[in-house]
């Protein structure tokens, strides 16, 4: 999915507002995903998935850091995310549909925390961006 210059600006601006809360938002999105889509828990059998667990917070920070990296390298995501793509495809073997589910939960989390900034245009741009990240992460599945 091609991001327009306006999409890139919207994504960078929106993610910039996330700032220091990125890890918290990542953890909240994971919790939403686990509650809304319980089958996603199967990839985390060794985690304490209770609200506020250190493991969920830690993984939420990893998710947020990966997205921060993707935002910083929005014009070269395939190269910037290659190691993460390899990890999810070859080692973790995550079902690609889970990236869509997490993306949806991230959008809900961002909208809940930044309702005034979450305009239809920003929503569309973030959705396209997360779809692009998902495409990159699933590119090594072939």
UniProtKB/Swiss-Prot annotation:
Tissues showing expression: Red blood cells.
This protein's UniProt keywords: Heme, Iron, Metal-binding, Oxygen transport, Transport
Cross-referenced PROSITE patterns: GLOBIN
Gene Ontology process terms (BP): hydrogen peroxide catabolic process
Record's keyword annotation contains Iron: yes
Oligomeric form and interacting partners: Heterotetramer of two alpha chains and two beta chains.
Role description: Involved in oxygen transport from the lung to the various peripheral tissues.
Range of residues in the leader sequence: none
Pfam families listed in its UniProt record: Globin
Organism the protein comes from: Hylobates lar (Lar gibbon)
Protein name as catalogued: Hemoglobin subunit alpha-2
InterPro entries: Globin, Globin-like_sf, Globin/Proto, Hemoglobin_a-typ, Hemoglobin_oxygen_transport, Hemoglobin_pi
The keyword Cytoplasm appears for this protein: no
UniProt-recorded Gene Ontology molecular function terms: haptoglobin binding; heme binding; iron ion binding; organic acid binding; oxygen binding; oxygen carrier activity; peroxidase activity
Family: Belongs to the globin family.
Gene Ontology annotations for the cellular component aspect, listed alphabetically: blood microparticle; haptoglobin-hemoglobin complex; hemoglobin complex
Binding site for heme b: 88
Binding residues annotated for O2, in chain numbering: 59
Globin domain location: 2-142
């Amino acid at each position: 999915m091609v991001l327009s210059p306006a999409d890139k600006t919207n994504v960078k601006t929106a993610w910039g507002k996330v700032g220091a809360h990125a890890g918290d938002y990542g953890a909240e999105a994971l919790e939403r995903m686990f509650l809304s889509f319980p089958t996603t828990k199967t990839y985390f059998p060794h985690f304490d998935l209770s609200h506020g667990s250190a493991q969920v917070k830690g993984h939420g920070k990893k998710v947020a850091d990966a997205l921060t990296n993707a935002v910083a390298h929005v014009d070269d995501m395939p190269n910037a995310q290659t190691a993460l793509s390899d990890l999810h495809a070859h080692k973790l073997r995550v079902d690609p549909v889970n990236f869509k589910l997490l993306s949806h939960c991230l959008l809900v989390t961002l909208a809940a925390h930044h309702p005034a900034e979450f305009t239809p245009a920003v929503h569309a741009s973030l959705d396209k961006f997360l779809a692009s990240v998902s495409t990159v992460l699933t590119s090594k599945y072939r």
